[in-house]
């Protein structure tokens, strides 16, 4: 998955193809990494932002700055900067001369967890809607614009992140240089499954186990293809790093990752109800839409 995402992303930004020489160069590149907690613009809410770039380089043009936003369940840090065989996607892009950032919206990763996430899931209504997440993305964009003295940057969203980035861009074209929507959400045309008669109301957040994550990743994959989809050791490395970003995960047995349900509520109210959450005709910047051709990959991305 990391190699696939990286190759696609670099092509979007007109970088070189991912060849063995590029990989070797990336591994030898000296990179600077900075982790920052930035204000969201709302009292008590801070957002985790990571930045990587070649060591010693501080000046970047707008077309060389990239911000990545995660999907519905897992944080950007382990989606975008998990070292596999000594290198992450973020490392590779930074080694090619880009100023690369990731952001976790509130409720995810190292960003502030809303107070509702310290209560039982069913005690409150769904939290962290796409609109709220787009606000957080905007805070990260503004932070980068000020830091690098530029007027716009490139933005990439993955899965739910495409809705976050799409909504933000539709309202802030002047701050976005280019937009990448990888595995975007859109209006679902298949009939909606009827809700169970005794189904409880959607709570503030959901709990996700490592086993359930693995099962959903591999759902529908032929047995002889599973080892190719997730090479040995990769899932465990990703899961351990991902669950470690939730300070409460280890308090349960098995460990459970908390993920806000605002995205699930938006799915029900918009995408599966035949309505778009944002108006794509209001996006005027160059945009690349990347869709998965294999159904299984689509499941993996949409559940991310």
Residue ranges, per PLM feature:
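Alpha/beta-hydrolase
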Residues: 190-290
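N-terminal cap/lid segment of alpha/beta-hydrolase-fold proteins
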Residues: 27-61
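Conserved alpha/beta-hydrolase "acid-adjacent" motif
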Residues: 295-302
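Alpha/beta-hydrolase active-site loop
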Residues: 121-147
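Conserved hydrolase catalytic core segment
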Residues: 151-190
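Short, surface-exposed "cap/lid" segments of acyl-processing enzymes
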Residues: 56-102
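Glycine-rich "HGGG/HGxG" loop immediately N-terminal to the catalytic nucleophile
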Residues: 76-77, 103-125
């Amino acid at each position: 998955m990391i190699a696939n995402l990286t190759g696609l992303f670099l092509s979007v930004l007109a970088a070189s193809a991912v060849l063995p020489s590029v990989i070797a160069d990336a591994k030898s590149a000296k990179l600077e990494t900075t982790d920052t907690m930035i204000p969201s613009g709302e009292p008590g809410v801070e957002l985790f932002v990571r930045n990587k770039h070649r060591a010693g380089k501080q000046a970047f043009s707008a077309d060389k700055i990239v911000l990545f936003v995660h999907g519905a369940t897992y944080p950007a840090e382990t989606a975008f900067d998990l070292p596999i065989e000594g290198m992450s996607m973020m490392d590779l892009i930074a080694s090619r001369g880009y100023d690369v950032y990731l952001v976790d919206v509130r409720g995810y990763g190292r960003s502030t967890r809303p107070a509702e996430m310290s209560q039982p899931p069913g005690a409150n209504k769904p939290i962290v809607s796409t609109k709220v997440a787009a606000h957080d993305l905007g805070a990260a964009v503004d932070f980068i614009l000020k830091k690098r003295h530029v007027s716009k940057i490139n933005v990439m969203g993955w899965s739910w992140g495409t809705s976050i980035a799409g909504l933000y861009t539709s309202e802030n074209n002047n701050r976005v240089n280019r937009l990448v929507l990888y595995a975007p959400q859109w209006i679902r045309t298949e009939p909606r499954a009827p809700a169970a008669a005794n189904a409880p109301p959607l709570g503030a957040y959901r709990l996700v186990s490592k086993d359930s994550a693995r099962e959903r990743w591999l759902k529908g994959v032929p047995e002889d293809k599973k080892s190719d989809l997730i090479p040995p050791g990769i899932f465990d490395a990703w899961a351990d790093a991902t669950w470690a970003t939730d300070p409460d995960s280890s308090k349960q047995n098995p460990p459970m990752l908390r993920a806000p349900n605002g995205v699930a509520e938006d799915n029900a109210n918009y995408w599966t109800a035949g309505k778009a959450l944002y108006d794509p005709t209001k996006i005027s910047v160059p945009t690349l839409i990347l869709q998965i051709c294999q159904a299984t990959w689509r499941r993996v991305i949409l559940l991310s």
